[in-house]
Regions:
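The feature captures the conserved acid-bearing segment of alpha/beta-hydrolase catalytic domains
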Residues: 161, 166-251
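Structural recognition of the beta-strand scaffold that forms the well-ordered cores
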Residues: 46, 62-66, 98-103, 135-140, ...
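Active-site machinery of serine-nucleophile hydrolases
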Residues: 62, 66-121
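Bacterial N-terminal signal peptides
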Residues: 9-18
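Gly/Ser-rich "nucleophile elbow"/oxyanion-hole loop immediately N-terminal to the catalytic nucleophile
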Residues: 51-58, 107-143, 156
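Short glycine-enriched nucleophile-adjacent loop
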Residues: 145-156, 162
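A domain-start/cap signature at the N-terminus of enzymes
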Residues: 20-62, 139-141, 184-186, 220-224, ...
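Bacterial N-terminal signal peptides that target proteins for export
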Residues: 1-9
Length: 265
């Protein structure tokens, strides 16, 4: 019996140690479901609430995240399964901000009512959790990258910083004619128009050089337009070996978050 116990003692010790190092629920951030009514219809979204130990003194910063095409739907959850959501689950004990995850319906784009839903969800989260209106941040990936430009152009004085990931302005309209930045659709030079209207907003654009879904050409042109407009602080990072999923490297980059949270309105 003693010999049998001695064989299992190392395993028992390991299990006890792992149990001791796991964090209690209150020490980790969590997602909670919420709903908002816009134009008479209810839309569901998620809010990431940071752990108390991760919060800095004062009001919480808040990040509005716009998902890509693959996360569209009506379940109110799928939008947390790619991009920022998985990163927050990995960093649930340390991420210091609220994050709001609206969801566009099945074949919708980030435009019109869907953008109103996103902003209504953001407003509701700010009111419920006492977030800092001067520290609102906007990011989106792929379709959400387009949406980031649309919402930022519609609300030019609202966000302290914008981080569009693998988005574009016009391309690839031939493949998907509904996917474009509608706020500048009538402009002769939409890149220059965006740069002029947002040149006072800190922006960090990310893209993969090998992106074969949304090629990086538009983001390169946008960055050049911002430079020509003498923009206040616009950066562009292109991952040489990166494909469309540039969001994985972007959201895992501590320098990006440090820069973002340093911005205030």
């Amino acid at each position: 019996m003693v010999r049998l116990l001695s064989r299992w003692l190392p395993l028992l010790a390991l299990l006890l140690m792992s149990g001791c190092t796991s964090l209690p629920d209150g020490a980790r951030g969590r997602f909670e479901a919420r709903a908002v009514k816009v134009d008479g219809e209810t839309a569901y979204y998620q809010v990431f609430i940071p752990a108390a130990s991760a919060r800095t003194p004062g009001s919480l910063p808040v990040v509005l995240f716009l998902h890509g095409s693959g996360e569209r739907g009506a379940d109110g959850v799928k939008q947390t399964h790619a991009g920022l959501g998985p990163y927050l689950r990995e960093q649930a004990a340390d991420f210091p901000a609220l994050a709001v995850f609206p969801q566009a319906p099945g074949r919708g784009e980030w435009s019109g009512r869907n953008n109103r839903v996103a902003l209504a969800a953001l407003d509701a989260a700010i009111a419920e959790f006492g977030a800092d209106p001067a520290r609102q941040y906007l990011t989106g990936m792929s379709m959400g990258g387009y949406g980031s430009w649309n919402i930022a152009l519609d609300q030019p004085g609202r966000f302290a910083a914008i981080v569009p990931v693998c988005g574009a302005v016009l391309a690839p309209r031939a493949v998907r004619p509904t996917l474009f930045v509608e706020q500048v659709a009538g402009e002769t030079d939409p890149y220059a128009a965006i740069a002029q209207r947002l040149r006072q907003t800190p922006i960090w654009i990310f893209h993969g050089a090998l992106d074969d879904v949304v090629p990086p050409d538009d983001d390169r042109r946008l960055h050049a337009a911002f430079q020509n407009a003498n923009a206040r602080d616009v950066r562009y990072t292109e991952y040489p070996e990166g494909n469309h999923n540039a969001w994985d490297a972007t959201y895992a980059d501590p320098a990006m978050w440090e820069w973002m949270f340093a911005q205030k309105r």
